[in-house]
């Protein structure tokens, strides 16, 4: 076990490094006409998880990239988490990953190259678990450690799961518990108890491979993964893109054990407030704890899945077959204001 604390070498952590949604919207605005290409099935106009390009014979190639600063101190775990997080975008589209290349920024005058080697070994382990090669990459000398992957995948075009095709009446499911940003903030503040040290990393190192199986279900109308914009942010993207609203049962939202204890100790990521400022106007009243948990930036978070109500039994049965015991966390309703509200 290394004595290096990687989180002390970066100003951000994991997907909490993301630029806020409101600022990103300004950056991505352009007066240039977008090129028309009918083969581009999914681009950046819908804020989806990855791009999909039609390559013929009902097949699409999926392309995505994701990288960030350390969210844990252990280099191998950092590599595993970053790899899981990047590959997740392929699964969120319903696809199968086939190859990855690494993106590495490293402060070579501050951190030994052997530590970067451990990061890469962690990524290789996850790529092997996903059945894909880490086939290359690019590195630069950077003031802070940064790592991630660019990932390529394949998909049957009929099975593409977008984030803007949900329907009124759909049930909402979340495949991983919330609280990752809160727990990793507790670690950075030195408040995390040793017996809780693996709660967040274990979730973050779990591949969202079940997304491939969800893609084969017609009753799954939309899917995305929950990362830096938190559950509320990614749910809002789904609702606004689909022209619907959502009602969430807060008590049914899964969360990591002991997360409320760390909220009480003030272990709140800076990204919580940035997220709420960006989209809070579209959300109904929240208690302080509800706001923190629902706006908590997730790294390598779970899949948010919209399921037709008549598909509830089949969907939950598939989940149970794959070790997931899921219950609906809410449902989609006709568009209204606020776009997302909590069950009273």
Curated annotation (Swiss-Prot):
ATP binds at residues 18, 46-48, 66, 89, 137-139. It holds the Pfam family AIRS_C. It catalyses: hydrogenselenide + ATP + H2O = selenophosphate + AMP + phosphate + 2 H(+). One of its GO terms (cellular component) is cytoplasm. Mg(2+) binds at residues 49, 89, 225. GO terms for biological process: selenocysteine biosynthetic process. Binds 1 Mg(2+) ion per monomer. The keyword Kinase applies. The active site is at 15. Its cofactor is Mg(2+). GO terms for molecular function: ATP binding; magnesium ion binding; selenide, water dikinase activity. The record marks 18 as: Important for catalytic activity. Belongs to the selenophosphate synthase 1 family. Class I subfamily. Synthesizes selenophosphate from selenide and ATP. This is Selenide, water dikinase. It comes from Colwellia psychrerythraea (strain 34H / ATCC BAA-681). The gene is selD.
């Amino acid at each position: 076990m290394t004595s290096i604390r990687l989180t002390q070498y970066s100003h951000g952590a994991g997907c909490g490094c993301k630029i806020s949604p409101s600022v990103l919207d300004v950056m991505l605005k352009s007066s240039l006409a977008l090129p028309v290409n009918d083969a581009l099935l999914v681009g950046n106009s819908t804020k989806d998880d990855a791009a999909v390009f039609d390559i013929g014979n009902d097949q699409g190639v999926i392309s995505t990239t994701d990288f960030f600063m350390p969210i844990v101190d252990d280099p191998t775990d950092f590599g595993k988490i970053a790899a899981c997080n990047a590959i997740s975008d392929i699964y969120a589209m319903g696809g199968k990953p086939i190859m990855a290349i690494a993106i590495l920024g490293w402060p070579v005058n501050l951190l030994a190259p052997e530590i970067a080697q451990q990061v890469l070994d962690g990524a290789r382990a996850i790529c092997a678990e996903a059945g894909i090669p880490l086939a290359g990459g690019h590195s630069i000398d950077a003031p802070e450690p940064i790592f991630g992957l660019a990932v390529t995948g394949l998909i049957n075009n009929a099975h593409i799961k977008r984030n803007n095709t949900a329907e009124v009446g759909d049930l909402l499911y979340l495949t991983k518990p919330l609280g990752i940003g809160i727990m990793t903030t507790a670690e950075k503040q030195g408040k995390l108890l040793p017996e809780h040290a693996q709660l967040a990393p274990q979730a973050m190192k779990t591949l969202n491979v079940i997304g491939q199986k969800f893609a084969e279900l017609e009753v799954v109308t939309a899917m995305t993964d929950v990362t830096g914009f938190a559950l509320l942010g990614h749910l809002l993207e789904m609702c606004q893109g689909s022209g619907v609203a959502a009602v969430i049962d807060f008590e049914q939202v899964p969360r990591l054990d002991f997360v409320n204890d760390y909220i009480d100790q003030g272990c709140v990521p800076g990204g919580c407030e940035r997220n709420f400022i960006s989209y809070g106007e579209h959300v109904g009243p929240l208690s302080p704890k509800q706001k923190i948990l629902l706006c908590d930036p997730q790294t390598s978070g779970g899949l948010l899945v919209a399921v037709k109500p008549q598909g509830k039994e089949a969907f939950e049965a598939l989940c149970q077959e794959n070790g997931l015991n899921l219950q609906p966390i809410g449902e989609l309703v006709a568009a209204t204001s606020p776009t997302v509200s909590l069950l009273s």
